[in-house]
């Protein structure tokens, strides 16, 4: 399935509520900062237990439109990586005209 701006995907939100923000990670190989995103709520929930979260912080899976996520991510120097329920990267989404490595 092709993702477009109105496709609903799922992300992990840190500190849900007034100070919430998307949960981000850094790719160990490329040192690229990215927001992990998922095609299903179940995949996001399954993967959350495997991610390096901070003790004392709250995390919540939320739906977001793909276009809103990529605009926010790219505007804050993050990329978007699609993950499966086991945390494997299935797709790397870089901003248009990015010099980022595509491997």
Regions found by a protein language model. Name each.
Residues 1-103:
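Conserved NAD+-utilizing ADP-ribose enzyme module
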